[in-house]
A protein has these predicted regions:
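Non-catalytic substrate-recognition and accessory regions of acyl/acetyltransferase enzymes
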Residues: 1-127, 141-156, 167-200
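Glycine-rich acyl-CoA binding loop
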Residues: 127-139
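Conserved short alpha-helix immediately C-terminal to the canonical SAM/SAH-binding motif I
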Residues: 135, 164-165
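Short strand-loop-helix active-site module centered on a catalytic nucleophile
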Residues: 138-143, 162
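His/Cys-centered metal/cofactor-coordination and adjacent catalytic loops
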Residues: 159
Length: 200
């Protein structure tokens, strides 16, 4: 199914200068995600700057038939600290190979791939052309390409604390919870995010 979609690194547009960035903004203008406005605003307002500053890289997913953006994802690398007490021995051993353990608390510190954004386009004009499973699978495929070139073994993401989303990541896609954090971006709307990881 992933082969049915075109996945483009937005650097390909950015390297063309202003004309390329204008093209990107035109593509972004058709992306709608009313279920999570932060996902929509990141793409339209921040993804270009973050990519230019090497803070993260955003990939857009295009349907080949209608040439519409059906989704996007953003990847970066971040340090994490993991308590592996609830993990299987196999997962624990794999994490231990690429991390340092704190002798005081037993937690592991490591660098991991972060899928920082994952968003579907809910614009009515394009229809429901990609599933969440397919979009996540495409993002994980891109992480595995990076793994092939630069090593690494762990990918993680942050989810809102909602059963529907957590079931999607845990039951359907094999991620495991390892921490929670309270967002500090908007104090008046602060909320808890659940951090989940997967060994790849």
């Amino acid at each position: 199914m992933e082969d049915d979609f075109l996945v483009l690194n937005i650097r390909e547009y950015i390297k063309m200068g202003k004309a390329g960035e204008d093209m990107l903004r035109q593509v972004f203008s058709s992306f709608k995600c009313e279920k999570n406005l932060d996902v929509e605003s990141f793409l339209t307002e921040q993804s270009i700057d973050f990519t230019k500053k090497n803070q993260s890289v955003t990939y857009i997913v295009i349907s080949p038939d209608k040439n519409n953006i059906v989704g996007y994802f953003t990847i970066t690398i971040k340090p994490i600290t993991v308590n592996t007490d609830e993990f299987s021995n196999t997962v624990r051993r794999k994490i231990a190979r690429v991390s340092e353990q704190n002798s005081d608390n037993g937690k592991y510190s490591l660098s991991a791939y972060l899928i920082a954004q994952l968003g579907k386009n809910y614009d009515d004009s394009i229809g429901n052309t990609i599933s969440g499973d397919n979009l996540l699978s495409i993002a994980l495929g891109k992480v595995k390409e990076l793994q092939y070139m630069a090593s690494g073994m762990v990918v993680f993401l942050e989810s809102e604390n909602k059963d529907r989303l957590l079931d999607f990541y845990e039951k359907q896609n094999g991620f495991k919870r390892f921490e929670t954090k309270v967002t500090k971006k908007y104090k008046e709307n602060s909320h808890t995010l659940v951090q989940l990881l997967k060994v790849i």
